[in-house]
Design a protein with these regions (language model features):
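Active-site neighborhoods and metal-handling regions in enzymes and metal-associated proteins
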Residues: 1-599
Length: 599
């Protein structure tokens, strides 16, 4: 079936239930960014494969909202579907709640699967549509009636992350969170987020591709903890370890029953941005809801000393693999056929040679030429193209190791470049280098740092329509909060001070539709720089250790400070990576990291 046929079947089910709109989000039951195959309902209906987007289906129309990363991709994938693309944040584009208010009649009904809609999103729709007395119908997953060959829920075995990697035991983490619960006056904490449950219990799984988490909820009280999980995924050994730490098991779907059974007067802590709407609706009226940002978010974001040191080890392994890949690509292109997909598979094979390699951390982006202008392009059998010994290849990839999670982008010159390609590459590199060299007082947020990366681009009348940086988990999601580097304060729902020990990305870019794209990305860890009479200064230490492409740099556009920072980074790369290379690869690394001279 194509999207037109699928939407027609969905509308039949909507009509049976007198629904005036049906909302399909990207999320699973845990508001996760990346989801398992079972939860890709929006992709199934629309054909749009991006990681962010919401579909609204009306009786006679449909619209899909996505952000700037996916404008070009979505416009291509939605062609012929009858679905209108709503470019979020652009002039004249309504937000979803306002759209629903304007298109659903008085006393009408909006349907959705309330397990996949966050409480905050449902609340925002309710507030906007209240004046028209519009009601919700959230008990049914109508997509399930249309998607006849839908994949089953994943149920992969859990595994334990040793304390040598995590740095804190399960008991220590539980005590920390219970301490925060006391401070916040909560007697029960409902934890629906997969990454938070995994972090708190030092457990990992394989229920979501690229993200080592498992389908679960945790109900935490001061004297006990209940893990709602698919029992067959938990070995007897892990169950015994959990029991010794005061954690008992319950069936995965029991979370709603357990919440509904909470006694009168219970003060229930939950994060409305991360808890689904059905959980909130299950809370008894006699209980009090404390809708607060989850305290685990900040705990998880500030990496332990052990996590930081392990991440350094992971990035050395990753740096070796990516450096070898760049050497291979530059020396093989034009001599034998290479496509985007074959290059992607080559890089994965090099990473897999590293000790403790687990999997990729997201779908690899290997984008040649004009494909590089599609911010989150992912090569498929249908879109794969051969690469030639000219132009640019944008490679945004990452990996999961026992020692940590990586995410790196390098834009690689495959041969001769145009003056425009070199100019754009160099401007992006300048912004990347300048953010990487930031020294700032504690108390700054990502909004304060963002302009360092964008200034060289703004001065040239250029910009990019995505964040400059996102937090990264430890053997968890490649994207995590609460830290974020972005200039647009209006889009920031929650502001976060940058703390020592946080790890986030530094990834400015420029994308010229139909031509090429450039993005350069390192992960950095926040460290203390100095403390003096003015306060506590922080700085950014690069974790990613892979050379930039000197073949793509226009040295005349670099300042003397840029040159100094470039040479210092390359010296660090050579010192860390060279012991693991030999022969021609080592000789190439020497050339790639040789100091450049200021013009």
């Amino acid at each position: 079936m194509n999207p037109v046929e699928k939407l027609a079947l969905l509308r039949v089910e909507m009509k049976k239930r007198h629904l005036d709109a049906y909302v399909v989000v990207t999320d699973d039951f845990h508001t996760s960014e990346y989801v398992g195959a079972h939860f890709k309902a929006r992709e199934f209906l629309s054909g749009f494969t991006g990681s962010a987007g919401t579909l609204v289906v009306l009786p006679d129309a449909a619209a899909l909202w996505t952000d700037g990363r996916y404008f070009l991709q979505a416009s291509q994938q939605l062609e012929g579907s009858g679905i209108e693309l709503m470019r979020m944040g652009q002039p004249g584009v309504p937000e979803i709640p306002a759209f629903l208010r304007d298109h659903v009649p008085e006393n009408g009904w909006i349907g959705f699967d309330s397990r996949t809609i966050s409480n905050d999103f449902a609340r925002s729709i309710g507030e906007k549509t209240r004046e028209k007395h519009i009601r919700f119908a959230g008990d049914e997953d109508l997509v399930d009636l249309v998607w006849t060959d839908r994949p089953a829920l994943s149920c992969e075995p859990l595994w334990e992350l040793d304390v040598q990697y995590a740095g804190l035991t399960r008991r220590e983490k539980l005590a920390m969170v219970r301490g925060k619960m006391k401070e916040m006056g909560a007697s029960v904490f409902v934890i629906p987020s997969l990454d938070e449950v995994a972090w708190l219990l030092n457990l990992r799984g394989n229920d979501v591709l690229f993200t080592p988490v498992f389908l679960s909820y945790l109900l935490l009280e001061q004297d006990k903890a209940t893990l709602c999980v698919q029992r067959e995924a938990v070995s007897a050994e892990i169950e015994a370890h959990l029991k010794s730490d005061g954690v008992t098991l319950a069936p995965y779907d029991d979370i709603y029953r357990l919440v509904a059974a909470l006694p009168t007067g219970t003060r229930v802590l939950l994060d409305g941005e991360r808890a689904n709407y059905r959980i909130l609706q299950s809370v008894p009226e006699s209980a009090e809801v404390l809708d607060r940002t989850s305290p685990i978010q900040l705990m998880k974001a500030v990496k332990t000393p052990a996590e930081q040191e392990n991440e350094r080890l992971a990035h050395i392994k990753d740096g070796v693999a990516v450096t070898r890949f760049i050497y291979w690509l530059k020396h093989t292109i034009g001599k034998e056929p290479i496509t985007e997909l074959s290059a992607s598979k080559k890089l994965e094979s090099l990473r897999a040679e590293g000790e403790h390699y687990l999997e990729q951390s997201f779908d690899p982006i290997l984008a040649y030429g004009a494909h590089g202008a599609i911010v989150h392009y992912e090569p498929t059998e249908e879109t794969d193209i051969p690469m030639e010994p000219r132009g640019l290849c944008l490679a945004d990839t990452g990996a999961q190791y026992l020692e940590g999670t990586t995410d790196i982008t390098r834009t690689i010159a495959l041969g001769p470049l145009t003056d425009e390609e070199k100019r754009i590459y160099t401007l992006v590199l300048r912004g990347h280098i300048q953010l990487g060299a930031a020294k700032f007082l504690h108390g700054c947020m990502g909004e304060n740092l963002d302009m360092l990366a964008r200034t060289p681009l703004w001065e040239a009348g250029l910009d990019f329509n995505h964040g400059t940086g996102h937090g990264v988990g430890f053997v968890l999601g490649v994207h995590e909060g609460p830290e974020r580097v972005h200039w647009d304060v209006k889009r920031q729902k929650r502001h976060c001070v940058i703390e020592e020990g946080m790890i986030f990305s530094n990834e400015p870019g420029i994308y010229l539709a139909g031509k090429f794209g450039v993005r350069i990305e390192n992960l950095v860890v926040v460290r203390e720089a100095e403390v003096n009479e003015y306060g506590r200064f922080l700085a950014l230490e690069p974790l990613t250790l892979v050379p930039y492409d000197r073949d793509a740099i226009d040295l005349s556009l670099l300042s003397s400070r840029d040159v100094e920072l470039l040479n210092a980074y390359h010296a660090k790369v050579f010192a860390a990576i060279s012991p693991y290379l030999s022969g021609d690869e080592l000789e190439w690394l020497k050339e790639a990291t040789e100091p450049v001279q200021f013009c």
